[in-house]
Amino acid sequence: MFIISGRTMLKKAQQEGYAVPAFNIHNLETLQVVVETAAELRSPLIVAGTPGTFSYAGVGNIVAIAAELAKSWNHPLAVHLDHHEKLADIKMKVAAGVRSVMIDGSHFPFADNIALVKSVVDYCHRYDVSVEAELGRLGGQEDDLIVDGKDALYTHPEQAREFVEKTGIDSLAIAIGTAHGLYTAEPKLDFERLTEIRQRVDVPLVLHGASGLPTRDITRAISLGICKVNVATELKIAFSGALKNYLTQHAEASDPHHYMIPAKAAMKEVVRKVIADCGCEGKL
C-alpha cells in the first residue's frame, strides 16, 4: 500500500521531534514535484488538496496519480483532504481511496464543532482514516474559505484539551498567529500559547498558514510540539511566477514541456526548503 493514513507518520514525528510537511497540490505537475522531491530526500510526505482542488482535478485522478508516483518512487505517502466541511463529501473521497482527512468546523460554535468532528471521526476510524480538526480560526484565504482578520480566533488551551477528549481526533490544527496566504507584515506567533496547548493535549499538533514564515519560527514551533506543517501559497507563487516569467520571455511558446520545466524547478526549491525547515529529511 502506497497511499497510507497520516496517523503513523505524525506519531513518529511527535516522538522524534520533527514535523511532516503537507504540501497543497493542484495538478499532475505539482504532484510530481512534491513526490519526486520528498522521495529524493527520503522525507515523509502528505499531499493535500482543498475541496476546490479535488473538484478541479477529480478525486479519483488525484488518488490514482499519487499512488502511481508513490509506487514508482517506492515512497508511501498520505493523500489528505484539507479544510473539508461536509461529512458526505468526506465519505465520498474516503471511498475513492483517501486515508487522511481534515474536517473544518472551526466556524461553528464549540459544541457544534465537537459534534461535527465526532461524526467524522466515528466514520473515518472504521476505515483506518486519520482525522485532523481545527480549533480556533486562521485569518486569510484558503480556497473559497475567507476569514477576515478580525474574525480570527486563537486556540484556547483548555478548550483544546476538551475538544481532543470529546472528539477522538488524531491531530489538532491550532491557531497561534499564522494566517492563510502571504503575510503583509512579519507574523508574531504565540509560542506561550503553543506550549500551554502542548501541555494539555497529547495528539500531534498542526500548523496551518506556514507559507512565508521565517525558518526560526518554524523550528521553534516544532520544538514546542508542532508535528505537521502546511504549505500552500508559497508553492503556488513559485510555480506561477516562474511560469509567467517564462511566457513573458518566450511569448510564442506553446509547448507545455518547455514552460512547465522552470515552473516545476521553482516549486521544487520551495519544497526542499520546507523539508529542511521541518527537519524531516531522511525520516521516512
Swiss-Prot record:
Q: Which gene encodes it?
A: gatY
Write down the Pfam families for this protein, in alphabetical order: F_bP_aldolase
Checking PANTHER family in the record gives: D-TAGATOSE-1,6-BISPHOSPHATE ALDOLASE, D-TAGATOSE-1,6-BISPHOSPHATE ALDOLASE SUBUNIT GATY-RELATED
Q: Which GO terms describe its cellular component?
A: cytosol
Q: Which SUPFAM superfamilies match?
A: Aldolase
* BP terms from Gene Ontology: D-tagatose 6-phosphate catabolic process; galactitol catabolic process
Residues binding Zn(2+):
H83, H180, H208
Q: In which pathway does it act?
A: Carbohydrate metabolism; D-tagatose 6-phosphate degradation; D-glyceraldehyde 3-phosphate and glycerone phosphate from D-tagatose 6-phosphate: step 2/2
Q: Which cofactor does it need?
A: Zn(2+)
Question: Which residues catalyse the reaction?
Answer: D82 (proton donor)
What does the UniProt record say this protein does? Catalytic subunit of the tagatose-1,6-bisphosphate aldolase GatYZ, which catalyzes the reversible aldol condensation of dihydroxyacetone phosphate (DHAP or glycerone-phosphate) with glyceraldehyde 3-phosphate (G3P) to produce tagatose 1,6-bisphosphate (TBP). Requires GatZ subunit for full activity and stability. Is involved in the catabolism of galactitol.
Q: Which InterPro entries match?
A: Aldolase_TIM, Class_II_FBP_aldolase, FBA_II, TagBP_ald_KbaY/GatY, TagBP_aldolase_GatY
Positions of dihydroxyacetone phosphate binding: G181, G209, A210, S211, N230, V231, A232, T233
Please tell me whether the keyword Protein transport is annotated for this protein: no
HAMAP family attached here? TagBP_aldolase_GatY (MF_01294)
Catalysed reaction(s) here are:
D-tagatofuranose 1,6-bisphosphate = D-glyceraldehyde 3-phosphate + dihydroxyacetone phosphate
Q: Which Gene3D superfamilies match?
A: Aldolase class I
Can you name one GO molecular function term for this protein? zinc ion binding
Q: What is its EC number?
A: 4.1.2.40
NCBIfam families per UniProt = cbbA, PRK09195.1, PRK12737.1, tag_bisphos_ald
Q: How does it assemble?
A: Forms a complex with GatZ.
User: Per the similarity annotation, which family is this?
Assistant: Belongs to the class II fructose-bisphosphate aldolase family. TagBP aldolase GatY subfamily.
Official protein name in the record: D-tagatose-1,6-bisphosphate aldolase subunit GatY
List the keywords (alphabetical): Galactitol metabolism, Lyase, Metal-binding, Zinc
Report the cofactor remark.
Binds 1 zinc ion per subunit.
